[in-house]
Amino acid sequence: MIGRIAGTLIEKNPPHLLVDCHGVGYEIDVPMSTFYNLPATGEKVVLLTQQIVREDAHLLYGFGTAAERETFRQLIKISGIGARIALAVLSGMSVAELAQAVTLQEAGRLTRIPGIGKKTAERLLLELKGKLGADLGTVPGGPAVSDDAVDVLNALLALGYSDKEAALAIKQVPAGTGVSEGIKLALKALSKG
């Protein structure tokens, strides 16, 4: 299995890339979140990859972070969710936003993504519950949330609060707040109910 590609970015045409690695050109599909962070063509690029082997094709999907790749892997395990829909989900929202939507059971946020209807959104919420939120801080190169916010979230989960309660409490903590102060503010928000 190909887990990582490092080479020269030859072409980029959303969502497709062509990366030259020692004279071999790899065609890779990426979510838009990764696409927007790519260097200019001709520059060096490093992507974490997921290879999918089908009867009629060998496909490579690339990601800028380990969190995106792991979320993609979780998504394609769900019945009825293929790589195309998984890429659409990761293009439509960040890993942190997806984890929050799952934690808060917000099907409406998922139905805004092209290709996701109400039933698919509900299946995603059901299948991903408990698989994303608690792991946010443990994935190297994780989502675009501060380490302090992840530490506060993990502290609340360790104290026995549910994913949903912890996520709602985190919303009450201003960005840039330290861990200890963040925990105090989150606990205060939880005590108010």
Curated annotation (Swiss-Prot):
User: Where found, per UniProt?
Assistant: Cytoplasm
Q: Name the InterPro entries on file.
A: DNA_helicase_Holl-junc_RuvA_I, Hlx-hairpin-Hlx_DNA-bd_motif, NA-bd_OB-fold, RuvA, RuvA_2-like, RuvA_C, RuvA_C_sf
**Which GO terms label this protein's molecular function in UniProt?**
ATP binding; four-way junction DNA binding; four-way junction helicase activity
Q: Which residues form a coiled coil?
A: none
The ranges of region (Domain I) come to 1-64
Region: Domain III; residue ranges are 151-193
GO:BP terms for this protein? DNA recombination; DNA repair
Principal location listed in the UniProt entry: cytoplasm
* Pfam families reported for this sequence: HHH_5, RuvA_C, RuvA_N
Q: What residue spans carry the region label Domain II?
A: 65-143
Keyword check for DNA damage = yes
**Can you list the GO cellular component terms from the UniProt entry?**
cytoplasm; Holliday junction helicase complex; Holliday junction resolvase complex
Cystine connections? none
**Keyword terms of this UniProt record:** Cytoplasm, DNA damage, DNA recombination, DNA repair, DNA-binding
Cite the SUPFAM superfamilies for this sequence.
DNA helicase RuvA subunit, C-terminal domain, Nucleic acid-binding proteins, RuvA domain 2-like
Residue segments, region Flexible linker = 144-151
What's the stated role of this polypeptide?
Answer: The RuvA-RuvB-RuvC complex processes Holliday junction (HJ) DNA during genetic recombination and DNA repair, while the RuvA-RuvB complex plays an important role in the rescue of blocked DNA replication forks via replication fork reversal (RFR). RuvA specifically binds to HJ cruciform DNA, conferring on it an open structure. The RuvB hexamer acts as an ATP-dependent pump, pulling dsDNA into and through the RuvAB complex. HJ branch migration allows RuvC to scan DNA until it finds its consensus sequence, where it cleaves and resolves the cruciform DNA.
Q: Provide the assembly information.
A: Homotetramer. Forms an RuvA(8)-RuvB(12)-Holliday junction (HJ) complex. HJ DNA is sandwiched between 2 RuvA tetramers; dsDNA enters through RuvA and exits via RuvB. An RuvB hexamer assembles on each DNA strand where it exits the tetramer. Each RuvB hexamer is contacted by two RuvA subunits (via domain III) on 2 adjacent RuvB subunits; this complex drives branch migration. In the full resolvosome a probable DNA-RuvA(4)-RuvB(12)-RuvC(2) complex forms which resolves the HJ.
Q: Which HAMAP family match?
A: DNA_HJ_migration_RuvA (MF_00031)
Q: What is known of its domains?
A: Has three domains with a flexible linker between the domains II and III and assumes an 'L' shape. Domain III is highly mobile and contacts RuvB.
What family classification does the UniProt entry report for this protein?
A: Belongs to the RuvA family.
Name used for this protein in its record: Holliday junction branch migration complex subunit RuvA
Organism, by scientific name, is Ralstonia pickettii (strain 12J)
